[in-house]
């Protein structure tokens, strides 16, 4: 039997069906601690081997809250991305990768497929060919995404792709202003020498900036200005990765 797989940034609209249990799913359900470990370790191992090397790549950790949100997305069986509002968790907009298949695949396989888009990606340039996808790769290696949660659903009413795997990443990557520079080039942990775990930084800034120009605003008006209430990362995180 030919196994079909599809991993898209923008999926074609298909008939909706409610996600339900499948006899083949229990081993892949992310309520299982071993699956959480596999998913998190796979992401971190791939983040360690980016080329060129990253000086500010954060280590990812598992979030049950994000996983629950990803499960809600998977259970819809729409085979398309959720809205920005549906991916906003505790005020933080998160990213999302999708993997559709006609038979169940391991999480490591799905994540590796996302990462393998790197063959079409050139740092600070973008896609190296037309009509190729790179957004899954850049999200997997987005330096500031440090929490993730994933989920799988079985969608029996879908004609082809009945297995639907979703990972969500917070904060989300693929920011338009730097989507082709998903991290800073430099020696591993170059930006976090005192908070490093085998090439990955362990000191994420847990504050967020609303504006892209917060560093410039800080220089102009200082953190005491009322407008800077929307620049908490710039003002509060002095040594953390932000």
Swiss-Prot record:
It is found in: Secreted. The keyword Signal applies. GO terms for molecular function: calcium channel regulator activity; potassium channel regulator activity; toxin activity. This is Cysteine-rich venom protein helothermine. GO terms for cellular component: extracellular region. IC(50)=0.52 uM on IA-type current, and 0.86 uM on delayed rectifier current. Disulfide bonds join 77-155, 94-170, 150-167, 189-196, 192-201, 205-237, 214-231, 223-235. Expressed by the venom gland. Alters a variety of ion channel activities, including voltage-gated potassium channels (Kv), voltage-gated calcium channels (L-, N-, and P-type) (Cav) and ryanodine receptors (RyR). Is toxic to mice (causes lethargy, partial paralysis of rear limbs and lowering of body temperature). Belongs to the CRISP family. Residues 1-19 form the signal peptide. The keyword Nucleotide-binding does not apply. Keywords: Calcium channel impairing toxin, Disulfide bond, Ion channel impairing toxin, Neurotoxin, Potassium channel impairing toxin, Ryanodine-sensitive calcium-release channel impairing toxin, Secreted, Signal, Toxin, Voltage-gated calcium channel impairing toxin, Voltage-gated potassium channel impairing toxin. Residues 41-169 form the SCP domain.
